[in-house]
Structure formats: structure tokens, C-alpha cells
Amino acid sequence: VPSPRPQNATVMVWIFGGGFAYGTSSLNVYDGRYLAQAEGAIVVSMNYRVGALGFLSLPGSPVPGNAGLFDQQLALRWVHGNIHRFGGNPQSVTLFGESAGSASVAPHLLSRHSQQFFQRAILQSGTLNAPWATVEDTEARRRAEALAQALGCPTDDDNELLNCLYARPPQEIVSKEGDVVIEPSIFRFPFVPVVDGHFIIDSPIVLLQQGIFKKTDLLLGVNRNEGSFFLIYGAPGFSKDHESLISREDFLENIPMIVPQGNEVSVDAIVLQYTDWLAQNDALKNRDAIEDIVGDYNVICPVVEMATRYAEFGNNVYFYFFNQRASNLPWPQWMGVI
């Protein structure tokens, strides 16, 4: 809250990112005091359950999924009902987030149960129609059962499975979350929002195509190098400790990991599109091409798609492309603007 306390101030509600797997609103990088002081706005942030504790889903059971989204919705409801006590205007609330936090903003735009609690939205480097941001109910069940199996819990009865999980320490559950992803992949997370027919009533792409979303002003944006951060966590040939010069062999090995559900035709199409055929063995170009594929597929194209759909239905849409590398960025130069 700015000092002196304002009257009827604009409110900004922040949702942190972290792949729906980790994070907290109390990190120094999310300190809202600077924004509040500079702009005279009230800045609110929240915590929400992440990982299996927030997004495990057994469709048809007492744990249908999306608990983390309901946490966010409850926070929005509280802000709507109480922010006037802090000098805020409940009719001037902007919801904003980054990465998975940005992908979290989208379901509130899509859900009629959340739409009344905010007026505008900002989505930074993520949206719900990205390939990593949701799963269908069948895949959600498979992941829940895989986690249960990794913890030695029964999987043939939902109630027994859940009772077994309830009895496990949270740290033990979290330690086994990575066991549910069956194929080597880049930019994928074990427990994410599920298309449950309630909070997310249909595929996000279908909802965007049909215009089933809050009609409002939208600001969206991406960074120049959206993919590089994720490459240093296991992509063949990549590391933050060297220049990550990528051979043709590593280039070809990376692509199925970037599109783990892709068939042979789609993989071949990606190779065709992103190969410099006059310099197939240029290690710098191969490195940059892989970074482009990861960023385009997982962030830039989905965000552009959402912006396009919103504009098609007559909404005011604003878009930014962030191209300025911070002088104090700790990552190597090859990772660019992240």
C-alpha cells in the first residue's frame, strides 16, 4: 500500500510463476513496494498450492483437481470484498502474472466464477493454451496414479489411493512428483491445471476460438529468448557453464524432447523450418535455433494466438516484445533476454 494511504486507488493483483511446481509470493524479486510507490497503486500478491498438493487430479473423486486455481480465486474474492479498507478501488483491479502465473491469469479470464473480481489483465510470457499449461482428465488421472504407485499406494480404488496419499508427509509427496513424467522432455511440469469441465470447461484453444472469455482490455508480451532458461536443465549439449555449442546430432536429439507428443511428421516439419540448410553444422546457429523452437512452441506462439483471438472479438489488446538484457543478469550471454 502506498504511503500516504490512497483513496480509491487502482489495484494490481500478482500471481507468481514456477511451472505450477514451485514458487512463493514472498521472493524479493516479487516485492510490490517499488511498483506501489512508483505508480501509486495497491499491489497484492498471494500464495497458492503448487505441484501435486495444488494440481493433482483424480476426475470423479473428491479431488477433481485445480485446487491451486481455486486458491487464487479465493484470494481474488477476498480482494474484491476487502480492498476498499486499504484505500483500493474494487472496480479497478488488474490481474497480472508471469510464466505459469500468467498461465494462471488465463483461466480466471475464462471462468465465469472469477470474472467479476477483476477488470483488466496482463499476461507475461505464458498462457493457458500453451502445450505445458494444461492436461486432459485422462492424463491427469494417469499422473495421479503414477505418483501413488511411486509412493507405494494402491491405484485400483480412488478412495484408498487418496487415503494413502493423505497419510504421507507432504515432503515425501513432493519428492516423487518428477516420477510421473514418462518421456524425456523440455519445458514440461508434472502437475498442472486440468480441463475439469468446471473451472476450465473445455480446451483453452476451443474457448478462445469461441470467444468464451471475459471481454476486457488485455496486455500481453514475451521476451526475446523465452526458451534458453529451460535448456540448461537437461537438454542435450546445453549448460550455463559454457557456450552450449550444439552439434547437428544434439540439434536433432533435442527436438523430440521439445515436442514429446509430436509424431514423426511434425518433428520433420520442425527440423525443416528451423534448419539453416547452408550451415547445418554451425554450432552457434544450431544452439540459437533450438532456443527459438522452445520459445516459439511453448511461449511466443501461444501468447500471440491468445492476443489474436482476443482482438478478433473486438477487445483492446496491447502487445510488447521485450528485447533489453538487464545489466545485472546472472546468466551467460548466450541465454539472451530472459
Swiss-Prot record:
UniProt GO MF annotations: acetylcholinesterase activity
PROSITE patterns in the record: CARBOXYLESTERASE_B_1
This enzyme's EC code(s): 3.1.1.7
Keywords: Cell membrane, Disulfide bond, Glycoprotein, Hydrolase, Membrane, Neurotransmitter degradation, Secreted, Serine esterase, Synapse
InterPro entries xref list: AB_hydrolase_fold, AChE-related_enzymes, CarbesteraseB, Carboxylesterase_B_AS, Cholinesterase
EC category name: hydrolase
Active site annotation, chain numbering: S99 (acyl-ester intermediate), E226 (charge relay system)
Similarity field: Belongs to the type-B carboxylesterase/lipase family.
Function: Terminates signal transduction at the neuromuscular junction by rapid hydrolysis of the acetylcholine released into the synaptic cleft.
Protein name, as recorded: Acetylcholinesterase
Species assigned in the record: Myxine glutinosa
Lineage: Eukaryota, Metazoa, Chordata, Craniata, Vertebrata
